[in-house]
Amino acid sequence: MWEKMETKTIVYDLDTSGGLMEQIQALLAPPKTDEAEKRSRKPEKEPRRSGRATNHDSCDSCKEGGDLLCCDHCPAAFHLQCCNPPLSEEMLPPGEWMCHRCTVRRKKREQKKELGHVNGLVDKSGKRTTSPSSDTDLLDRSASKTELKAIAHARILERRASRPGTPTSSASTETPTSEQNDVDEDIIDVDEEPVAAEPDYVQPQLRRPFELLIAAAMERNPTQFQLPNELTCTTALPGSSKRRRKEETTGKNVKKTQHELDHNGLVPLPVKVCFTCNRSCRVAPLIQCDYCPLLFHMDCLEPPLTAMPLGRWMCPNHIEHVVLNQKNMTLSNRCQVFDRFQDTVSQHVVKVDFLNRIHKKHPPNRRVLQSVKRRSLKVPDAIKSQYQFPPPLIAPAAIRDGELICNGIPEESQMHLLNSEHLATQAEQQEWLCSVVALQCSILKHLSAKQMPSHWDSEQTEKADIKPVIVTDSSVTTSLQTADKTPTPSHYPLSCPSGISTQNSLSCSPPHQSPALEDIGCSSCAEKSKKTPCGTANGPVNTEVKANGPHLYSSPTDSTDPRRLPGANTPLPGLSHRQGWPRPLTPPAAGGLQNHTVGIIVKTENATGPSSCPQRSLVPVPSLPPSIPSSCASIENTSTLQRKTVQSQIGPPLTDSRPLGSPPNATRVLTPPQAAGDGILATTANQRFSSPAPSSDGKVSPGTLSIGSALTVPSFPANSTAMVDLTNSLRAFMDVNGEIEINMLDEKLIKFLALQRIHQLFPSRVQPSPGSVGTHQLASGGHHIEVQRKEVQARAVFYPLLGLGGAVNMCYRTLYIGTGADMDVCLTNYGHCNYVSGKHACIFYDENTKHYELLNYSEHGTTVDNVLYSCDFSEKTPPTPPSSIVAKVQSVIRRRRHQKQDEEPSEEAAMMSSQAQGPQRRPCNCKASSSSLIGGSGAGWEGTALLHHGSYIKLGCLQFVFSITEFATKQPKGDASLLQDGVLAEKLSLKPHQGPVLRSNSVP
């Protein structure tokens, strides 16, 4: 029925393929958009590649960056040294490289496929994983229950380790969990092992519980040890990095909070304002606090910020800034404090806590807050004693135009040095003179026996008269000595130059005088010259007249009678035992004696002061009588030799010819007190030591020639042939006649005298040729010292102030002071003091501070610039008291020692002391030791004293001045006027061994 009702379609035999309707519709159709096609089009899923597209930026083992080796099958990356095993650049494979974990997994897959083919389980082995139930069924057949538990536990560990790092995981690799286990994927493939196929293989593998863990560790990539999350710090401290959100990392547009809409800090309505200035972000960008809702401008903070903070930032309204701002606080303490103040604190809680603390009557633990004390220094007891017992102040030294002004006449405190108790005794004088005479005679006999011809001796016996003429200097005041210890009634002013030696005084002795008497008288004169100055700087000193002491004469010198003394008006009987004989000014070795003092060269400030170059007069001396013993007569034979060696070192002192009653005038010191031989000026040397011109008859007086020329003659060694010939020729002609004929002199002698005269006229321009005269070596020890001083430049000079002894140059970095013979400055040469030690002090130069310092060694102390430096005699307390047992033992020992001392007979205990034991000590100017000024505690200052130019140093009662040459050699501004007066010539004429001028602006 239905078939009948179906209509039949009419089929037309038309060709519709060639119609134009489709083309017409295509032309009339509206344009199509591509969006619909894109939406409808499904993205074609790319096939998964075997390796990862990106690898980690840090090493999976040490979590550090650098040159990394990337795995081609997983995102792991390693350093060459972090691989397992470590690799080198030469060991890198040319193709793909797989890490240790991927290599183990690949081997396991290959083993699984091979086992599947053997057992006919190829389909099962092709699957990646099997269900846990199937594994359990297989294990039930071959393993026990304990083995199943171990496998289940291993599977749980495997899943925990492989969760964050699986290829299908969408978690970011930057999370803390992924940093720990980022590439762990299927570490233990228990599911993939064909357990059923090899039941015997599984059973021994699970015998021990740690075997499975060891197997899992062998299959993992090497990693460094890391603490678990439970032990790491998770507190968000200020300054830590912020964790970015997923939307920020992916770049997707996510709805943000109102105050974070703009990246530049611009916040739209509702407006957010700054907490400090209440202005919006239109003024400047706002900074949001990460711990509270407050915002701030960068310029409103204190101190202002220069850039936006990168990490977590905490605003200044938090109390954590005060609590966490401690230097010695550990991380755990910071975390505890931060967690404590993280929540808001109720104001009522603060009030209640305050009230509870106030109303507590008996608090369990009351802590008394100690007041903060100011930092203070403990003043040493030595400094306290200096203020309690201050030493006497130094007399103010007058300083004018940068020059030190002092008084020429000694003070009352120094007058004791001129008393007779400090002079040598008669026995000492006789012993000294006898030893000097014996030494000189032995030297002369030795030289004469070797090289002196015999005809000189024959000629000496034929000659009888000796008429030496001595050039005297009226500027030096000396005295006469008498044999019976009584002064002569008449007084004569006698002037003796420093060149007169002991032989000249001996030659004037009377014929009937005994040798012993002569020795005693002459030795007393020589010793007096050591102990007392021949003349003071600004005038004579009124001293006590004794038998062998100095005697002053006031009569003018207008007579030249050979029977009289120089300048005498009253004739003296030649054979009388009371006749006075001229006292020698200095002994031959006076330059090296300890207490000898020569006159100080000074520049007086009065225009009408005494002249330093007085006129000279010729004083004849009686001839030597034939009754003089040979020991004394032989001394005169060495007069020429001693004039050359001794007189060249002894300078004539200058004295003031004013009367004793005249008031002392202040003088400006130009040179310090020098030893014998210092203080010869160039201006006076040309007048005093020049050889006189010959007379009309061609004769020259021998005394004038020997004294005037021998002062600057360069010395020769004692065994030199030229020296012996010169000595013999001069002695022969001087002993025979009173005058010398130039025609009779030797040619070598004439050349020598001419050369000596040239040296006097041109001392600095003309140098003697070494081949013409001989080697210019020095005969005396003092001259050798002078040569050494020329070679080594002095750093500083140590000057005495009491007028005794000479200045000592500090040529090296240290200068030792004391009474010992090995000291650089022997204090016995500068006077007597009972409170000085053998090694008293040391002056040294510190290379680091570039200063001179003095270190005291003596128990008596040293005063530097009115500050006492001494030893610390205070009792030192032990740092810790002894224990009870030790104290008991010590008390028993002490008691036993006292019992032994009581039983033994009392004896005087020997004590070491720097003071001399035995005879009574000589008095000195010290009232007591300087250590008595320390105080009751006995704590002296043992530090070093800083020395400046002009520092005043006092050792007992001996006073010195320390002068630095680099300051002393600087000339002041007022030297331009001194050039006109000729004073500069005197300064430049100082000898090299003379100390520099005490003149500087830094004198304290």
From Swiss-Prot:
Biased composition (Polar residues): 641-650
Residue list for modification Phosphoserine: 131, 134, 555
InterPro entries: FHA_dom, PHF12, PHF12_MRG-bd, PHF12_MRG-bd_sf, SMAD_FHA_dom_sf, Zinc_finger_PHD-type_CS, Znf_FYVE_PHD, Znf_PHD
Gene3D superfamilies, alphabetized: PHD finger protein 12 (6.10.20.60), Zinc/RING finger domain, C3HC4 (zinc finger) (3.30.40.10)
Record's compositionally biased regions (Basic and acidic residues): 32-59
Residues annotated as domain FHA: 815-869
Region (Interaction with SIN3A), start-end ranges: 102-273, 300-704
GO biological process, one term: negative regulation of transcription by RNA polymerase II
Residues given in the record as Zn(2+) 2 binding sites: 289, 292, 315, 318
Family matches, as PROSITE patterns: FHA_DOMAIN, ZF_PHD_1, ZF_PHD_2
Main localization category: nucleus
Sequence segments annotated as region (SIN3 interacting domain 2): 328-364
Region (SIN3 interacting domain 1): 202-241
Record cross-link Glycyl lysine isopeptide (Lys-Gly) (interchain with G-Cter in SUMO2), residues: 467, 900, 973, 987, 991
Binding site for Zn(2+) 3: 274, 277, 297, 300
Assembly and interaction partners: Component of SIN3 complexes. Interacts with SIN3A in a complex composed of HDAC1, SAP30 and SIN3A. Component of the SIN3B complex, which includes SIN3B, HDAC2 or HDAC1, PHF12 and MORF4L1; interacts directly with all subunits. Interacts with TLE5.
Free-text comment about domains: In the context of the SIN3B complex, the PHD-type 1 Zinc finger delivers the H3 substrate to the HDAC active site. The atypical PHD-type 2 Zinc finger has a structural role raher than a substrate recruitment role, wedged betweem SIN3B amd the HDAC and stabilizing the SIN3B:HDAC2 interaction. Also interacts with SIN3B through the SIN3 interacting domain 2 (SID2). Interacts with MORF4L1 through PHD-type 1 in a SIN3 interacting domain 1 (SID1)-dependent manner.
Name listed for the protein in its UniProt record: PHD finger protein 12
Organism for this UniProt entry: Homo sapiens
